[in-house]
Structures are given as C-alpha cells and as structure tokens.
Amino acid sequence: MAKLGIKHYRFSMAWSRIIPDGRGKVNEEGVDFYKRLVDCLRDHGITPHATLFHWDSPQALEDLYGSWRSREMASDFADYATAVVSRLGDRITHWMTINEIPSFTHMAYAVDKQPPKAPSTRVSSLKEVWQTCHNALLAHGLGCQAIRAASPSSCSVAMVADIGVTVPLTESAVDVAAAQQAFHTSWFNGGIIFPVLTGAYSPVMLEKLGADAPAIQSGDLKTIHQPLDSLGINNYTGNYIRAADNKQGFEFLDLPKAYPRMYIPWIHILPESMYWGIRHVSETLGRKDLPIFITENGCAAQDEVNDKGEVIDTDRIMYLRQYLKAAHRAISEGYPLKGYFLWSFMDNFEWESGYSRRFGITYVDYKTQRRIPKASFKWYAECIQQNRVV
C-alpha cells in the first residue's frame, strides 16, 4: 500500500470476530487484530476508514432469531458498534455503518444469491424481504447513534449504498428528466437511500409495493434518518433511460447482446454511471450539501501471470480510466465528490463468484500467497503521484 502511494484505506470488520456470539462478551483478541492493522496503516501515513458490517452476519444470531428477519438485529448491531468504537475510536475517526443493504437482504432473502444457497435463507413473501431491509436500515440508524456516543473524539459517520444509477440515453432535457424520475422509482434508491437521506420511503415506491411494504413502527423513520457526514456510493455500472410516451414518462433500455462487459456478467461498461450517480444523489435528492465518496469502483478481469511473471490487465486500466474521467467531470461541475476508493487493492473472495473472479490491482497466488502488482497497480500509482487521470 505504501508503494502504491495511497493515503486512505477502506476495510471491513467482522462482527463475529469481535463478538463471536453476536451479542454479549467481546473477544479482545479480535479487537487486538484490528488495532495492529490500524496501527500499521497509520505508521505508513494511511488513514483508516472502517466499515462495521459487510454482510457477515454472526451465525449465532441467525440461529437465535433469524438475524435480519428480526428487529433484534438492529439493537445487537448497535451494541456491536459501541463495542468496536469504544475500543478503536482512539485510532479510527472515519466510520461507515453498513455496506450495500440490498446485497444481504433482497439478494439473500429473495433470490438466494448472497451468500450462495444459504440454507433456510429465502423467505416466503416480498413483504418479509422488505422487512429485512427495514430492519437493516434501523441498524444503520442505531449504529450511527452508537458510533457518535462511543467515539472519544469527533468522528465522521457514513453509510455505503449501491444505488441504482439511471443514465439518460442522451443529455437532452427530456431524457435527463426521465432519468431523474426513474431514479426515484428504483427500489435501490426509493427503499434505501431515500429513507436514510430524507426520512421517508419514496411515495412512488410505496405505492408500487402496496401491501408488500414493510411494517414501519412509530419513530422508525426518525431513527433511520440520522445526520451523516458523507455518503458512500459503490459504482460499477448502471441502466440507460430515455423519455417515453407512457404513464411513467420513461423506459429502461435493454442492452444489446454484444454490449461490452468486463469478465463478470453484471458489469457492463457504463462510465457515465459514475457521473450520473453522483449528480442524482446531489441534485435529484436535493442533498448538494452532502459530501460523497466513491467507496467501491472496479471490475473483474481475466488476469493471468505471463511468462515474465507479469499481469498485464490493460482492460482493467481502460475501465478505471473511463470511470475516473467521469468522476472528474462531476467534480469539475461542482458536485461534492470528495474521495475515491478503488475495489480492490488485491484479489479477494467474491460472494457470488468465490475466487473465480479477480478484482484486485494486486494479483494473489492463492496457493503460495505471493502478491504480484498488476499493470493496473503501476498505472494507478502514477495517477496518485500526478494527482490526475493518466
């Protein structure tokens, strides 16, 4: 990391490493692991940004009450946040509560994808799926309160969202307006970032859900709508939208079969999604005051070590260069983008793909654990050194 030249590093903590039973006794050895990690980062001039939950629910709470199916999960998450921040708040001042709520609610309880084919995960109705999502939003809100209460000094609190980015097919006034309207109707947005940033679910989305909308108790929305110091956005791709002569006034466009994708089916290359995601949050939601960080952006590539011991991932460089240029456009137009985290520093375990897809700019030989900086590593280091897209 020091060789790469980064000054900020985002990582996630494992709830069950800190509190093995999900609630109750804290494992101080687990805390010590993160103390060593953070101390090493700081010794190298790297500021840590910690995400408290990145999908690894404690099995004990799954067995006890079904984890996110229960509102109890929210209060247990707050207790976990208190345990972490009270022990590490002297080292970490940048906190993120939860990463990508749809990924462990809708993608797990509705379609059995994350984690893949987890036993007894799928629930019987859409309403139950939305209830898991609502419970996670409550956890975010209670987690924000817990972080601020436990931190020994002033700190920054954020949430990380994988928003549904609606990209206008053209930048004509009618297509831009259509994309803005479509942004409201996406459940990624209307059901997640709307309550977090505005204190209410999108009326359009609630009308669409009808009886499948989650049960909302008195005070829930106030709890969810906590003051944030920034919003993290994970951006990989998006959807094209154009104006249409229908009830909605817009339509989502299917991509051609030959549309370029990276080495994973769901990442079709759409760099404009970077710009429009930032713009929609700032403009469409009326939150021009809220700093935005890109907390994930990157892609899988078919990385192979050549006979010179190198990994020449020029396709990843192409992808990153286009997305960073779109981010620069957002900054140049005055939108409050304040930082960028590349996904990822090194090859990792992907929830759907396991070790079969590589997202890192550092190649990991999983048998020997040897690390090989890829061509994209050297390119990104040059971007950092020159403080521009090269």
Region annotations inferred by a language model:
Residues 1-14, 226-231, 284:
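Catalytic domains of carbohydrate-active enzymes, especially glycoside hydrolases
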Residues 22, 31, 35-390:
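Active-site region of glycoside hydrolase catalytic domains
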Residues 3-31, 62-68:
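N-terminal substrate-binding region of glycoside hydrolase catalytic domains
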